[in-house]
Amino acid sequence: MAIQIVLIVGPTASGKSKLAVDVAKEFNGEIISADSMQVYKYMDVGTAKITKEEMQGIPHYLIDIVEPDQEFSVAEYEKRAKEIIKDIYKRGKLPIIVGGTGLYINSIIYIMHFSDFEGSKEFREKMKELANTYGSQYLYEKLKSVDPEAAKKIHPNDIRRIIRALEVYEFTGKPISYYQKMSGMRLNPEYQPIMIGLNFRDRQILYDRINQRVDEMIKNNLVEEVVNLLKIGYNKDSTAMQALGYKEIVEYLKGEISLEEAIEKIKKGTRRYAKRQITWFKGYDFIKWFFVDDYKNYEELKKNIIKYLAGKLNF
């Protein structure tokens, strides 16, 4: 029998983490993160990582599992997440996957054709050298020429994902977008996914929440977090330091831009990222959208989502 899994997706700053905890409390669940930046240790503020207090005793998995200079592939995520789902299910609990990284979500619910693809560390190092010499835009243009479809979904500064897409093309002869489409045709029969999407009818409300979150990150010592990462020995080329919110602070610390400019760049980049996330999740035809601004308050939103899930789950 297929394992029922609840997936809570949506753009950054939409309230997914809080909702996941409430759903877990209601249905005896445990939570698996699907966030490609929260896998990294020592990066709490800039990734808006859930705190121990906010977890309210609910077990959370795939958070704080790798060093900031380590690579963590979709294949590795898929392997670990599926093992954890099985374990949660065996213990009679509900697996809840929460996050905004579309490829991580896909690796669970679809049969991914490129998930076993390991690639080449040598190739990745070579690409990083090119990026250091000519800038990330150089690699982005390269990707646009071989896989324009994938390039549309990847930010020009997201070196990690640009290199991954180039690597898949280099070693399989087919663009990564081809495999993503292929995977979309076949849902994984091991699971019965029940997907909740959080969104806003008024996009400006989401953008205001993003701006507020970035301001809070600065108040909560994001700059100090980046300084500490650099002190430990991680540099601007470390895998995780390429992330939105970190690379801009590194630019500020190097005197290339002011703090105000760094904050504005983070806000703008995050708003763009949220827009791309919404586009991605709209591609799931089985998603049930809940618009946060349709409800008087969070309690009313939560009540409606729990009612919807109660009608779907065998729990």
UniProtKB/Swiss-Prot annotation:
<dbReference type="InterPro" id="IPR027417">
    <property type="entry name" value="P-loop_NTPase"/>
</dbReference>
<keyword id="KW-0067">ATP-binding</keyword>
<dbReference type="GO" id="GO:0006400">
    <property type="term" value="P:tRNA modification"/>
</dbReference>
<keyword id="KW-0460">Magnesium</keyword>
<feature type="region of interest" description="Interaction with substrate tRNA">
    <location>
        <begin position="35"/>
        <end position="38"/>
    </location>
</feature>
<comment type="subunit">
    <text>Monomer.</text>
</comment>
<comment type="function">
    <text>Catalyzes the transfer of a dimethylallyl group onto the adenine at position 37 in tRNAs that read codons beginning with uridine, leading to the formation of N6-(dimethylallyl)adenosine (i(6)A).</text>
</comment>
<protein>
    <recommendedName>
        <fullName>tRNA dimethylallyltransferase</fullName>
        <ecNumber>2.5.1.75</ecNumber>
    </recommendedName>
</protein>
<dbReference type="Pfam" id="PF01715">
    <property type="entry name" value="IPPT"/>
</dbReference>
<feature type="binding site">
    <location>
        <begin position="12"/>
        <end position="17"/>
    </location>
    <ligand>
        <name>substrate</name>
    </ligand>
</feature>
<dbReference type="GO" id="GO:0052381">
    <property type="term" value="F:tRNA dimethylallyltransferase activity"/>
</dbReference>
<dbReference type="InterPro" id="IPR018022">
    <property type="entry name" value="IPT"/>
</dbReference>
<keyword id="KW-0808">Transferase</keyword>
<feature type="binding site">
    <location>
        <begin position="10"/>
        <end position="17"/>
    </location>
    <ligand>
        <name>ATP</name>
    </ligand>
</feature>
<comment type="similarity">
    <text>Belongs to the IPP transferase family.</text>
</comment>
<dbReference type="GO" id="GO:0005524">
    <property type="term" value="F:ATP binding"/>
</dbReference>
<feature type="site" description="Interaction with substrate tRNA">
    <location>
        <position position="124"/>
    </location>
</feature>
<keyword id="KW-0547">Nucleotide-binding</keyword>
<keyword id="KW-0819">tRNA processing</keyword>
<dbReference type="InterPro" id="IPR039657">
    <property type="entry name" value="Dimethylallyltransferase"/>
</dbReference>
<feature type="site" description="Interaction with substrate tRNA">
    <location>
        <position position="101"/>
    </location>
</feature>
